[in-house]
């Protein structure tokens, strides 16, 4: 990302030897795909049951909107007052982590963990992984677009009842299985 006295002048992607005005400053940003393996967080599902849910996210910076990651996300300077590529990427990773937690909480709160009705065709976190993953990708894309970040893939990698109610819910599932087996 090239700036001329703090004003954005363009992005440069080519390798090799190139002449650039010496008054322009360049900020290097990696375009590689990155992974985020979010630790499971405790949220309430649609029915109010506490669950533990985690996600795996693959993301990268959009080539055409890389300037957004430089100007729209605040990066802290080191002791010498210079923002390094490493600190800028850490701030982007932190931004992605916070936004992914918020999107995961939002999606988990919209659906029940499991279907307790007789019809069995409602969308739940446990049985409808494709629909949930698509919705999660959509929510993450909305949140991360302001930083020029593209969501490559988002999946739920951990889903369980919270420890305080896990035993009770297991007994409930076993009882439902016994009742349905008798019918």
Model regions and ranges:
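Short acidic loop-to-helix transition motifs that present clustered carboxylates
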Residues: 161
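Interfacial loop/beta elements and low-complexity acidic/Ser/Thr-rich segments
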Residues: 1-35
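Long, charge-rich amphipathic alpha-helical coiled-coil "stalk/tentacle" segments
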Residues: 164-183
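Short acidic, gly/pro-rich beta-turn/loop elements at beta-sheet edges
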Residues: 12, 16, 67, 164
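Amphipathic, interface-forming alpha-helical segments with heptad-repeat character
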Residues: 31-158
């Amino acid at each position: 990302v090239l700036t001329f006295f703090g004003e954005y002048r363009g992005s440069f992607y080519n390798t090799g030897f190139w002449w650039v005005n010496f008054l322009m400053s360049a900020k290097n940003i990696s375009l590689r795909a990155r992974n985020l393996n979010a630790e499971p967080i405790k949220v309430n599902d649609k029915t109010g049951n506490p669950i533990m849910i985690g996600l795996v996210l693959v993301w990268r910076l959009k080539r055409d909107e890389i300037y957004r990651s430089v100007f729209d996300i605040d990066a802290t300077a080191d002791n010498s007052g210079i923002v390094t590529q490493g600190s800028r990427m850490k701030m982007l990773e932190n931004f992605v982590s916070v936004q992914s937690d918020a999107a995961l909480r939002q999606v988990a709160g919209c659906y029940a963990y499991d279907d307790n009705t007789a019809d069995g065709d409602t969308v739940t976190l446990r049985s409808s992984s494709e629909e949930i993953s698509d919705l999660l990708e959509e929510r993450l894309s909305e949140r991360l677009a302001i930083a020029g970040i593209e969501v490559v893939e988002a999946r739920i990698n951990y889903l369980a009842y919270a420890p305080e109610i896990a035993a009770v819910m297991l007994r409930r599932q076993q009882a439902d299985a016994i009742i349905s087996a008798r019918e």
